[in-house]
């Protein structure tokens, strides 16, 4: 479906700097652990029907911090998405309030097949659930089912300097093929929509990869700018509660599995957009296909196997994959594999992948076979998201001076 990537990684990021980059760099140098627990809370959805602004309670220890993440509806999730993002998201469910979004609006900013978008959306949702996301703990929904995403994006666009968007490397890279003049406005404003996805739900944390920090930097800058332009005393004079309109989201950086590399190039990330399917393991690949891909994957001619050798990126990547899917410690893998040849290790890795992915594939088939069950989950997730987003939108419209509809 065009540019396939996980929204939790917030796409391809560059080293562009904004005015508060120094403070963010210090923040990112000490990333929040995925397993931490917290006592303060994010906003709740109570009272969202009223016309007044909604106050937040940041002191109760009984409400979890909120994490928002998502993925584009490619319909085909690969191992990099799973190990780098989804597997970690599953681990977040017990510690945080979690919202997982199928971001179909993002999928249409580049050419795509209209006949496949809907199916890809449900297939991706089914894969989310098959990977272990528990709807009793987390909300799963489709971005376009919650119109507030686009509403908030427009409000944010009005406060985002063009120069900030021009620095985003994603637009430069994605528009290169068609030429800047032929690229869509949607592609250019893509970062504002991603920021809306985060800020709409007053996210406390956003899962991002080590190499993908530019978007969370932009989201923080936009949140701070809007708070300055419309929050505080200005908002209070319009009848609001004053204070900040948005929380400033913080990055949540996975400590393992955050960067799974291509099977054909150990220096490039595993990606759906890579032209060769041989470069990735898809979660729904058959057993025979997994064996074949691992058998043919790029290796090297060094003796033995080892982690963390800059001259052996493929070796480090394959050992890291094996470590994660086998559930073993790094030291255990080093001891087990240090004297192995590639001919011995590759079947071991293929078997570990098959064993790890087989339950996911079986669960996926069960979910896809029950479309009404999936529809109900996505509808309930959207209801919860709308409830949360309504608080933010009501406050934003009030703070920006809009005349709001009165319901009779």
UniProtKB/Swiss-Prot annotation:
> Which Enzyme Commission number(s) are listed?
6.1.1.2
Against NCBIfam families, the record matches this protein to: trpS (TIGR00233)
User: Which organism was this protein described from?
Assistant: Arabidopsis thaliana
Q: Which InterPro entries match?
A: aa-tRNA-synth_I_CS, aa-tRNA-synth_Ic, Rossmann-like_a/b/a_fold, Trp-tRNA-ligase, Trp-tRNA-ligase_bac-type, Trp-tRNA_synthetase
Keyword Mitochondrion found: yes
* Keywords recorded for this protein, A-Z: Acetylation, Aminoacyl-tRNA synthetase, ATP-binding, Chloroplast, Ligase, Mitochondrion, Nucleotide-binding, Plastid, Protein biosynthesis, Transit peptide
Class of the enzyme per the UniProt entry, highest EC level: ligase
Transit peptide boundaries:
1-52
Q: Where does this protein hold ATP?
A: 72, 78-81, 209-211, 260, 269-273
Q: What is the residue range of the motif 'KMSKS' region?
A: 269-273
Annotated positions binding L-tryptophan: 197
User: What superkingdom does the record give?
Assistant: Eukaryota
Intervals of motif 'HIGH' region: 73-81
Protein name per the record: Tryptophan--tRNA ligase, chloroplastic/mitochondrial
Q: Name one GO biological process term.
A: tryptophanyl-tRNA aminoacylation
List locations, semicolon-separated.
Plastid, Chloroplast; Mitochondrion
In its keyword annotation, does this UniProt entry include Lyase? no
The N-acetylserine modification is found at: 53
UniProt family annotation = Belongs to the class-I aminoacyl-tRNA synthetase family.
């Amino acid at each position: 479906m065009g540019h396939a990537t996980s929204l939790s990684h917030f796409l391809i990021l560059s080293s562009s700097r904004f005015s508060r980059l120094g403070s963010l760099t210090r923040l990112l140098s000490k990333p929040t652990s995925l397993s931490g627990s917290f006592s303060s809370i994010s906003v709740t959805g109570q009272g969202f029907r009223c016309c007044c602004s909604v106050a937040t309670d940041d002191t109760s220890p009984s409400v979890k911090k909120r994490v928002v993440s998502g993925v584009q509806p490619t319909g085909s999730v690969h191992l990099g998405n799973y190990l780098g993002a989804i597997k970690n998201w599953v681990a977040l469910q017990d510690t945080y309030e979690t919202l997982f979004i199928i971001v179909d609006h993002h999928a249409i900013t580049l050419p795509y097949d209209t006949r496949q978008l809907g199916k890809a959306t449900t297939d991706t949702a089914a894969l989310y659930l098959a990977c272990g996301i528990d709807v009793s703990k987390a909300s799963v929904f489709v971005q376009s089912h919650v119109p507030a995403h686009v509403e908030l994006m427009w409000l944010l666009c009005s406060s985002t300097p063009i120069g900030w968007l021009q620095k985003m490397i994603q637009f430069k890279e994605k528009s290169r093929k068609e030429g800047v003049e032929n690229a869509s406005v949607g592609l250019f404003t893509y970062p504002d929509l991603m920021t809306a996805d985060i800020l709409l739900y007053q996210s406390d944390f956003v899962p991002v990869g080590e190499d993908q920090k530019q978007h969370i930097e932009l989201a923080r800058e936009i949140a701070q700018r809007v708070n300055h332009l419309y929050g505080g005393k200005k908002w209070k004079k319009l009848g609001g509660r004053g204070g900040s309109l948005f929380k400033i989201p913080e990055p949540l950086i996975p400590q393992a599995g955050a960067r799974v590399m291509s099977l054909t190039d150990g220096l490039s990330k595993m990606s759906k957009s890579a032209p060769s399917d041989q470069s990735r393991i898809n979660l729904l690949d058959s057993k025979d296909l997994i064996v074949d891909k691992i058998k043919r994957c790029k290796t090297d001619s060094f003796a033995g196997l080892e982690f963390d050798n800059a001259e052996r990126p493929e070796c480090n990547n394959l050992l890291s994959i094996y470590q994660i899917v086998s559930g073993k410690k790094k030291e255990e893998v080093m001891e087990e594999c240090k004297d192995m040849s590639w001919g011995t290790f590759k079947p071991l890795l293929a078997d570990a992948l098959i064993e790890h992915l087989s339950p996911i594939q079986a669960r996926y088939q069960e979910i896809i076979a029950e479309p009404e069950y999936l529809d109900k989950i996505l509808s309930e997730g959207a209801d919860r998201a709308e409830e949360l987003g309504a608080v933010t939108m009501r406050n934003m419209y009030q703070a920006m001076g809009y005349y709001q509809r009165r319901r009779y």
